[in-house]
Amino acid sequence: MDAATRDRNIATWLGDAPQPVRDTTNRLLERIAFLRAEQTIYPAQDDILNALAYTPADQVKVVILGQDPYHGPNQAMGLSFSVPATQTKLPPSLRNIYKELKADLGCPIPATGDLTPWAQQGVLLLNTTLTVREHAANSHAKLGWSTLTDYVIERCCQLPQPVVFLAWGRFAQQMVEGKLAATGAGKATGKFCLASTHPSPLSANRATAELPAFMGSRPFSAANRLLEQHGSTPVNWICLG
């Protein structure tokens, strides 16, 4: 992606954002750049806003929420659940996502963990915290990224086009349902929440009182049905390498 396209896509999110959101985002980007002098932080500085850069607001069809980036080397790339194509060992949650993709759509397991082709089709792959210290999960959860990511999720609830939220895990479910309620969005406005347990090996096969198990939930075909029923083109989920 060239720099002009990247800036233009990010501007679809931040151009009209309230000043406190823009100020906080700029402050955090500067702070993270400063902290890199004394600690290893993921993802790379230029990748922090990749979710917004690859999926402009007017193209969003599906939102997949994560919590924070992978905290091991050569994994985080600014898109939730995604790893670079050069990463040969897939994280366990992504392996389960691919198993469910195969079961749902009958496609082969993708050879790469790079989900950029999904993002380029309108799948917003957003972590609610955008950075993490190496080997320290949730270490940046209280830095203030929620000012930006809460705003982005609220924007998704208010977009004119149909949007399907794939809420994997209790955290994502509560986040999405809370934002839908707060913005008055829902089925009548073309906004849908498909919730299940998280694809982590600890929960992927375990239904709870509130959530069906991720494995067997068939989220990809379900999202496409909702998109098509409301006049939007489906996502080509099997486009990965």
Indicate where each model-derived feature is located.
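C-terminal capping/extension of enzyme domains
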Residues: M1-R27, I32-A37, E100-L105, L130-C157, ...
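Short, well-ordered beta-to-alpha junction loops that form the rim of enzyme active sites
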Residues: Q45, Q67, T128, A167-F171
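A short acidic-Thr-Gly-centered motif at the start of a beta-strand
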Residues: L49-D58, C156-Q158, E177
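Adenosine ribonucleotide-centric catalytic and binding domains
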Residues: T55-P110
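A general structural motif
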Residues: Q59-V60, P160-P162, G190
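Glycine-rich anion-binding loop/nest that anchors nucleotide
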Residues: I64, L148, C156-A172
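Short, conserved, surface-exposed binding loops centered on an aromatic residue
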Residues: D114-A119, C157
